Amino acid sequence: MASEKKDKLEPQIKSVDMSEDMQQEAVEVAIEAMEKYHIEKDIAQYIKREFDSRKGATWHCVVGRNFGSFVTHETKHFIYFYLGHCAILLFKTQ
């Protein structure tokens, strides 16, 4: 059953400045968040708190279907991807 959800949530990386390992971790955390929560704010909060805990502060996360962005981020700490119809922007600042 869990593999069915993961199959539906195939990540599509749109823009990235992040190691392969961290990209994979970001996708895995996002999948966990989307399995636990259905409200975009709650999904973003889960991802942000997980990355703050695992990788150190300060991470920012935006989750949604229709938004524009232009951000400054630490080198090697940025990813923008889709899981299903939901866009996820995750980045770290100093």
From Swiss-Prot:
Family: Belongs to the dynein light chain family.
Species the sequence originates in: Emericella nidulans (strain FGSC A4 / ATCC 38163 / CBS 112.46 / NRRL 194 / M139) (Aspergillus nidulans)
PROSITE patterns given in the database record: DYNEIN_LIGHT_1
Cited SUPFAM superfamilies: DLC
Domain of life: Eukaryota
UniProt xrefs under PANTHER family: DYNEIN LIGHT CHAIN
A Gene Ontology molecular function term of the record: dynein intermediate chain binding
Any GO BP: nuclear pore complex assembly
Keywords linked to the UniProt accession: Cytoplasm, Cytoskeleton, Dynein, Microtubule, Motor protein, mRNA transport, Nuclear pore complex, Nucleus, Protein transport, Translocation, Transport
Presence of keyword Protein transport: yes
Compartment(s): Cytoplasm, Cytoskeleton; Nucleus, Nuclear pore complex
Reported function: Acts as one of several non-catalytic accessory components of the cytoplasmic dynein complex that are thought to be involved in linking dynein to cargos and to adapter proteins that regulate dynein function. Cytoplasmic dynein 1 acts as a motor for the intracellular retrograde motility of vesicles and organelles along microtubules. May play a role in changing or maintaining the spatial distribution of cytoskeletal structures. Also a component of the nuclear pore complex.
Origin organism lineage: Eukaryota, Fungi, Dikarya, Ascomycota, Pezizomycotina
UniProt protein name: Dynein light chain, cytoplasmic
Gene3D superfamilies, per database record: Protein Inhibitor Of Neuronal Nitric Oxide Synthase (3.30.740.10)
Primary location class: cytoplasm
Subunit description: Homodimer. Cytoplasmic dynein consists of two catalytic heavy chains (HCs) and a number of non-catalytic subunits which present intermediate chains (ICs), light intermediate chains (LICs) and light chains (LCs). Component of the nuclear pore complex (NPC). The nuclear pore complex constitutes the exclusive means of nucleocytoplasmic transport.
GO cellular component entries: cytoplasmic dynein complex; cytoplasmic microtubule; meiotic spindle pole body; nuclear periphery; nuclear pore; peroxisomal importomer complex
